[in-house]
Each structure stands twice: as C-alpha cells, then as structure tokens.
C-alpha cells in the first residue's frame, strides 16, 4: 500500500554546493517503504528561498553599520565631552587623534583582511567577525576604566578599530558574493536574472550615513545622563549585540567554500595580480586619496568643539552639525558614482575627483573660515556642503577602478578589482592617521591666537587652512592628466 509522506517545505529543500536550492520528492514504492523517487530543482522555490536569504543578508549588512561606524562617526561628541569634563591624567588635546586614528586603523586593516579572507580563510569569516565583535566590545569596556589619556587612545583608537575592521571585512566580502553581478537569483551562476550588488552596497552605505545622522544625538544623551564611563559600557553592549546579529545573518556563500576545479585551480585563484603597481596611475590616485582623507576627518572630530568654543553655540546645535555633516552622504555617494558610470555623459575619474575636491575646499575656505560668533546658519551650510562633496569622494573610486581596469586591458594584464579597492581604502587610512597626528601641532600653533571675528583668527585657524588645502590636493589627479596630455602634444 503506497503512501505519501507529509513533509514541510523546509524539510523538502536543501542547498547544494553551488548555493542551488534542491527539492527532494518522496513517495511510496508500493511496498510501504519510503524512498527518494525524484530529485529536481524547483525554480520557484529556489528563487523564493534565495530572495529571502539575500534579504536577510542585506538586513544583516545594514545592521552591521551601527557597531562598525557608530562610534567613529560620532566621536566629535565624545571629543567635546572629554575636553569639557577632563579628569584623566595627560593632556586632553591628545584626544583629538582618537577619532582619526580609529578611522585610520580601520581603513588600513581592510587591504590585509580582504586579502586573507577572500579565499584562503573564507571558511573562517564568521568566526573572525565574531572575534572582532568581542574585541571591540572588550575594548570599549576597558576604555571605561581609563585613568590616562593614552588608555583612551589605545582602546578606542586602536583596539576597538581593529575589532570593527574584523567585523567589516568578512561581512562585506560575503555581501558582495551573495549579490554578485554574475549570480542568478538561485544562487548559482548562469544566465538568469542578475543580482544588484551595486544596489546592495548602496543600501549599506545609506545605512552608514543614517547611523552617522542619529548616533551623535544618542552619544550626547548617554554622556549627559551617565557620564563617559557608563556610556562606553552601554555602547559596548549595543555594539556586541548588533554585531552578533549581523554576523549570524551573513553566512559565507557556498561557492566560496568549495573548490570544484581542484587544488591547482584553487591555488591559482588565490594568486593576486600586482601588475597595476608597475604603472603610475594607481599611485596618482592613491596619493590624492591620502591627501584628501587627511583633511576629511578633521571636521568630524573638531566641529562640535569649534561650535561651542568659537561660535558659542549650544550643545544641541553643536551635535546637530555632525548630523547635517553625515546626511548628505546618502545622496552624494550615488550621484558621484553615477557621474563616472552612466551612458549619457560619463566623466573621467580625474574630473569627478576634482569636482569633489574643489567644492570641498571652497566650502572650507569660504564658509568654515568665515564663521563668527553665533553664526549657526553658516556652520550648518558648511557642514551640509562639505559633507556632500567630501562625503562623495570615496564614491569616485569606482571610476578609478574602471580606469585601472582599462589600463590593464590595454597592457593585456590581469587585475583584481577587489584588491585595488582594498588598497584605496588603505590609502584612506593613511590619510586619516596623518591628519590626526598633524591636527595636534596645528592646534598648538593656533593656541596663541586670540579669538577673533572669524574662524581664521581663532585657535582653529591652522586646522581650517589645512583642511582646505588638503581637499584641494585631493583633486590633483586632473592636473597630472592635463600635464601628461600636454607632454604628448609637445
């Protein structure tokens, strides 16, 4: 007597080595014994399951932006609190390097972690990310027991940033693989509907800017109600909880964990082509990124303090500046990416970076430098303008990578776009660290200046000039391109 087993959809399906959803159909054999009668892939079930999985992965990546960037994007609020409520040994001026050091360490770690977790240690991504979450949380807890300024620098600027980098790199690599442009909705490769990796990155970048919009107010509330020690412990718990949740939601893609072509093919795929380092183009853009990043982190760190000390604004207004600084980045990243990658009027990478750099410099020199006591409107205008144009600078890297890929094709050379992107992030990290180290002597240089009518005449005058000049040099690639073209003509 035959019979059909009643099995749930979850039990009917599993995932094969390629990420394909496979449905098993069970039936009777006429003798009452159950066996597998057919084995088939079901496109509808496969696509539904894959879409659900990608939605959860995108949710996890979006959540991860809070623990990764929340502290660094709101550090200006902590910086202001440290200066106004200083009780630790050492100079409070040193706290100015924490925010830029945190960003620098995070970005500098990306090239190395990307190289390690791309293939060789891909199976250990979630473990590494969990270890990073634990390290970041522990660092913030240890920081709450600080008694000297260097304790803050070591825990918040270095250790916590390393932990955040360990969360960022593995999860971002997996996100890109699940939304690979050449992968079908079913999870395998083929000619089906392509997934939107760029859209996925755009959503997570938008969430990063959303974090930067509300975190300053959250940090302010925690500091005012509990003080920095309890606030750091609360943040450690929030960072750990959201990190673990995001890590659970972002598994490594199955195709990365298998080697269908054998050991030789796996070894070949691990080799990273470095031919692009022989050409001048990469170094031109890398230097430009370093210079632009050196000044980019300074407003994020010092704007709240500047608003309180120089323009005499309230704490709420000072915090609002950071929110206004981060919000425009949601739109700017998409716009600058579109300028260098559209079918109607595509602009070269040098042109787009020059637009971002020049407008950022003008905003700094003409708006920030000319603010005076009580000029909230002008500071808000600077925050929005600088945040838009400088915040969109990293979105120009897609055009930079396209140019390097075209150059590699011209020379018939292989190129790894992911590795180039990691190195560009590393250049950004060098800029962040350099800017943080330079900011302290610049503040000391302006320390003897009396508070004047405009920002240039204040203690922050040298910092304002440095930010403006570094922004200008962030677009020097267009000068190099014009010079090279002129040489060829002559």
Regions found by a protein language model. Give the residues of each.
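Conserved MFS/SLC helix-loop-helix module at the cytosolic interface between two early adjacent transmembrane helices
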Residues: 108-150
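Cytosolic juxtamembrane N-terminal segment immediately preceding the first transmembrane helix
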Residues: 2-70, 255, 267-275
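Intracellular juxtamembrane helix-capping segments at the cytosolic ends
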Residues: 82, 164-187, 200, 392-411
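C-terminal transmembrane helical hairpin of 12-TM major facilitator-type secondary transporters
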Residues: 326, 346-400
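Helix-to-loop junctions at the C-terminal end of transmembrane segments
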Residues: 109-123, 332-348, 367, 443
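Hydrophobic core of transmembrane alpha-helices in multi-pass small-molecule transporters
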Residues: 62, 66, 136-140, 149-167, ...
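Extracytoplasmic gate region of multi-pass secondary transporters
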Residues: 67, 71-80, 279-338, 345, ...
């Amino acid at each position: 007597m035959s019979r059909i087993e009643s099995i749930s959809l979850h039990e009917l399906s599993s995932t094969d080595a390629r990420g394909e959803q496979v449905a098993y159909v069970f039936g009777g054999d006429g003798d009452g014994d159950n066996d597998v009668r057919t084995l088939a892939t079901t496109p509808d079930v496969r696509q539904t399951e894959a879409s659900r999985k990608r939605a959860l992965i995108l949710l996890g990546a979006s959540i991860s932006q809070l623990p990764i960037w929340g502290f660094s994007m709101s550090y200006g609020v902590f910086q202001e609190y440290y200066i106004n409520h200083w009780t630790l040994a050492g100079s409070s001026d040193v706290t100015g390097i924490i925010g830029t050091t945190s960003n620098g360490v995070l970005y500098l770690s990306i090239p190395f972690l990307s190289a390690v977790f791309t293939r060789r240690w891909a199976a250990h991504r979630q473990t590494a990310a969990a270890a990073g979450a634990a390290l970041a949380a522990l660092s913030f807890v240890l920081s709450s027991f600080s008694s000297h300024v260097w304790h803050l620098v070591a825990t918040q600027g270095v250790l916590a940033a390393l932990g955040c980098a360990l969360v960022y790199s593995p999860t971002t690599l997996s996100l890109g693989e699940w939304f690979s442009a050449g992968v079908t909705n079913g999870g395998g490769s083929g000619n089906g509907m392509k997934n939107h990796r760029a859209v996925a990155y755009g959503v997570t970048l938008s969430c990063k800017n959303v974090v930067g919009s509300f975190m300053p107010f959250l940090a302010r509330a925690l500091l005012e109600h509990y003080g920095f020690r309890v606030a750091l412990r609360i943040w450690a718990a929030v960072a750990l909880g959201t990190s673990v949740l995001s890590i659970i939601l972002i598994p490594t893609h199955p195709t990365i964990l298998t080697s269908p072509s054998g050991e030789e093919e796996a070894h070949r795929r691990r080799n990273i082509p470095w031919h692009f380092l022989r050409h001048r183009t990469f170094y031109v853009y890398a230097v430009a990124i370093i210079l632009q990043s050196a000044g980019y982190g300074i407003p994020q760190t010092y704007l709240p303090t500047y608003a309180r000390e120089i323009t005499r604004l309230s704490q709420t207004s000072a915090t609002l500046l950071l929110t206004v600084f981060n919000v425009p980045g949601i739109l700017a990243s998409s716009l600058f990416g579109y300028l260098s990658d559209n079918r109607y009027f595509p602009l070269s990478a040098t042109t787009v970076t020059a637009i971002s750099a020049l407008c950022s410099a003008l905003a700094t020199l003409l708006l920030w430098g000319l603010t005076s006591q009580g000029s909230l409107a002008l500071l808000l205008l600077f925050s929005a303008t600088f945040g838009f144009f400088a915040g969109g600078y990293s979105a120009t890297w897609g055009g930079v990578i396209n140019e390097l890929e075209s150059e590699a094709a011209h020379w018939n050379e292989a190129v790894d776009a992911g590795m180039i992107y990691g190195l560009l992030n590393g250049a950004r990290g060098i800029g962040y660290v350099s800017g943080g180290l330079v900011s302290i002597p610049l503040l000391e240089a302006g320390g003897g200046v009396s508070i004047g009518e405009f920002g240039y005449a204040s203690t922050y005058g040298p910092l304002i000039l440095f930010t403006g000049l570094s922004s200008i040099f962030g677009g020097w690639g267009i000068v190099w391109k014009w010079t090279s073209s002129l040489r060829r003509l002559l």
